[in-house]
Amino acid sequence: MTVVSGASKASGADLLDYDVVVARFDPVFGLEVHVELSTVTKMFCGCATTFGAEPNTQVCPVCLGLPGSLPVLNRAAVQSAIRIGLALNCEIVPWCRFARKNYFYPDVPKNYQISQYDEPIAINGYLEVPLEDDTTWRVEIERAHMEEDTGKLTHLGSETGRIYGATTSLIDYNRAGVPLIEIVTKPIEGAGVRAPQIARAYVKALQDLLRTLDVSDVRMDQGSMRCDANVSLKPIGTVEFGTRSEIKNVNSLKSVEMAVRYEMQRQGAILVSGGRIAQETRHFHEDGYTSPGRAKETAQDYRYFPDPDLEPVAPSRELVEQLRQTIPELPWLSRKRIQQEWGISDEVMRDLVNAGAVELVAATVKNGASSEQARAWWGNFLVQKANEANITLDELAITPAQVAVVVALVDEGKLSIRLARQVVEGVLAGEGEPEQVMVDRDLALVRDDSVMQAAVDEALAADPDVAEKIRGGKVAAAGAIVGAVMKTTRGQADAARVRELVLAICGQG
């Protein structure tokens, strides 16, 4: 047994060797994922939900909780919640309602948050999570419920950016009232040594699913997807769960894995030393450790009661069935089918998935390109452009249809690959459609034999020694003349045709 005192340099906490943890304890974890829905307006008012607006410019009496204001439920948010529940194999309840979650904090202007307590819209689901070894792990879903988001606090003056040690706190209420769906798993047992990886895989699968449903952009870096992880340990062979700690606002896939692993090691060190785990919330730090937050509240602390300003929600069976028809193929099943259709290896498919290119390649193929051509563009050149701009592939200012047009221009002999890249750069720069960029930049391949022959004659005259070598049978020397012609024509001549003309003129054709 190895307990390393102060093993976490940043936190100073004792950590138990990971192999010892999983040999002695069964980790039990649960995940609560908060997802901002991509609706145009907020959950209970008409304010915009645009990310990045000037602070406190997307607010009104309703989301500020001013006296006399009344909430009006966003129908689109309810429909998105139902679709999410269906995609998670949940039961959509015939009747649910909102409750007030009462607590006092600066980011809650009403001093309560409108949420759902004991009557959520979706219950008892599951998600088959694909793992890296091509197996799956079923994660049971306890509930998915609707609520409004809180405002955003920015703490100044502390080294960590958190409230501890801060001298000033700024509040932006633009986020207050943005529609949220909170997806809560049942306790996940039996994962053993794979617990951190399964936690990460679940959040990744959920992220892919919600993106496919087009209900959220699930940008963890922007806070539109946030994860809380509940972790506890119990001795192997026992039934009763241990005391859990809740790790708040874990904001990346890597952090989910790191947070679960660290917390297992921290709790393991306490338990083998005869200590007790405190029921508390903890903050995750990017250095890979957690620190104490506050004592964990219970449901009674929030004094839930039905919101008297909102009627119950009772989705009809007809509506639920209509929305069921809009649920697309699960993204990982779609990828497996696509991989078989394209005949590509697991490694190539993994690279496309990691680049976020699968759906873009598939859409390009639907627009007429071959899978090889589409992969070459999205998996190489366009990935480079996205990385240079520090954005994701789907944020590039080019569509799969436009990429397919570029591919067609190459196939038709109007562009070389090098010229096609310049056309794509023009599209990315906002210069117009591919054909227009080709014309405006004068990038079309030169196909006129008379123009190319004149350029060949000029190049041969400028380098008589090379011309003589070609006439003497050294056809490899034709490359120098081809290069000179390509330079003269700015790379727009058909190199293969230029070579044919050079050899013909020199009597080697």
Curated annotation (Swiss-Prot):
Enzyme Commission code: 6.3.5.-
Cystine bridges: none
GO molecular function, one term: ATP binding
Keywords (A to Z) from UniProt: ATP-binding, Ligase, Nucleotide-binding, Protein biosynthesis
Enzyme category, top tier: ligase
GO biological process, any: translation
InterPro entries given in the database record: Asn/Gln-tRNA_amidoTrfase_suB/E, Asn/Gln-tRNA_Trfase_suB/E_cat, Asn/Gln_amidotransferase, Asn/Gln_tRNA_amidoTrase-B-like, GatB, GatB_Yqey_C_2, Gln-tRNA_amidoTrfase_suB_CS, Gln_synth/guanido_kin_cat_dom
Alphabetized Pfam families for the sequence: GatB_N, GatB_Yqey
UniProt KW Protein biosynthesis keyword: yes
Catalytic activity reported: L-glutamyl-tRNA(Gln) + L-glutamine + ATP + H2O = L-glutaminyl-tRNA(Gln) + L-glutamate + ADP + phosphate + H(+); L-aspartyl-tRNA(Asn) + L-glutamine + ATP + H2O = L-asparaginyl-tRNA(Asn) + L-glutamate + ADP + phosphate + 2 H(+)
Family: Belongs to the GatB/GatE family. GatB subfamily.
NCBIfam families from the UniProt entry: gatB, PRK05477.1-2, PRK05477.1-3, PRK05477.1-4
Record note on quaternary structure: Heterotrimer of A, B and C subunits.
Name of protein: Aspartyl/glutamyl-tRNA(Asn/Gln) amidotransferase subunit B
Organism: Mycobacterium leprae (strain TN)
